[in-house]
Amino acid sequence: MIEFGDFYQRIAKGNLSHWLDTLPAQLSAWQRESLHGKFKQWFNSVEHLPALTPTRLDLLNGVRAEMDTPLSPGQLEGIEKMLRTMMPWRKGPFSLYGIDIDTEWHSDWKWDRVLPHISPLAGRTILDVGCGSGYHLWRMLGAGAQLAVGIDPMQLFLCQFEAVRKLLGGDQRAHLLPLGIEQLPELAAFDTVFSMGVLYHRRSPLDHLYQLKNQLVSEGELVLETLVIEGDRNQVLVPGDRYAQMRNVYFIPSAEALKCWLEKCGFVDVKIADMCVTSTEEQRRTDWMTSESLAEFLDPNDPGKTIEGYPSPLRAVLVARKP
């Protein structure tokens, strides 16, 4: 089973220590009661991976690990086999000793859009809500974060994260917890909180914004990345059964409406930092994610629309401060 003792030890001293009042019991209950049917299979693959320490590790420009003495073809084949048992790989890419995990999403492109607009991460304690396999946690460390904590209830992502961690030298500055934001107490302990690709999946988006705010220290920064539509402050799309083949999409506001929502929730200095149409180069089917992707979710006769007839995915980055 996955042990969280290193994380408990890491937060025992500092602003997050009060989380220990509830977190160990939550995660123990999760291990007892909530494991996915395939979890043991996925975690068995993690356990069969070698614990490697790279000679060169680049988290600033990507997630890339290399050895001075290359691994043997047999070692590489064994590692790749274990990693492929954890498909699909959606967020990345990762370059691990010559094994290139070409993920569905170019999450590095999103990071390049976000990073120029946010406060420097050096020395910060960070929360990444809905972090997926943790790709951006590693990039946060590359940008100088002291501690990067990701939460995501999808258990495959936890195993993917632990697999990458094992191949990167067991770094304890990044941690992924199998929780949703609604399971966190009001910690008010993070310098920066990221919520990227989550808001449109929430039935109550304003409640989500308050949940994010409650995790921030005073003067802390929220980085919010989500689907938006073109339009003024009064424009919000409420899709029907599906949006781009996704069932659980509830509200897609305009960027201006989202700015108003943030201000209504008490955030200040709200800025629309970036807007970008998602391309089929950024999100696509790969050898590591072989099912349908964005190209199949768009109208084949009009790529400016989803297959359901809605505007095709447009993503915005907003940055705001908790006073």
UniProtKB/Swiss-Prot annotation:
Which domain of life, per UniProt? Answer: Bacteria
A GO BP entry is: tRNA wobble uridine modification
> Keyword annotations for this protein?
Transferase, tRNA processing
Pfam families per record: Methyltransf_9 (PF08003)
Cite the InterPro entries for this sequence: CmoB, Mo5U34_MeTrfas-like, SAM-dependent_MTases_sf
Q: What class of enzyme is it?
A: transferase
What EC number(s) would the UniProt record show?
A: 2.5.1.-
Keyword Transmembrane present in the record's keywords: the answer is no
Catalyzed reactions: carboxy-S-adenosyl-L-methionine + 5-hydroxyuridine(34) in tRNA = 5-carboxymethoxyuridine(34) in tRNA + S-adenosyl-L-homocysteine + H(+)
Q: Name one GO molecular function term.
A: methyltransferase activity
The entry marks the following residues as binding carboxy-S-adenosyl-L-methionine, namely: K91, W105, K110, G130, I181, E182, M196, Y200, R315
Outline what the protein does.
Answer: Catalyzes carboxymethyl transfer from carboxy-S-adenosyl-L-methionine (Cx-SAM) to 5-hydroxyuridine (ho5U) to form 5-carboxymethoxyuridine (cmo5U) at position 34 in tRNAs.
Q: What is this protein's record name?
A: tRNA U34 carboxymethyltransferase
Q: Highest lineage ranks of the organism?
A: Bacteria, Pseudomonadati, Pseudomonadota, Gammaproteobacteria, Enterobacterales
The gene it comes from is cmoB
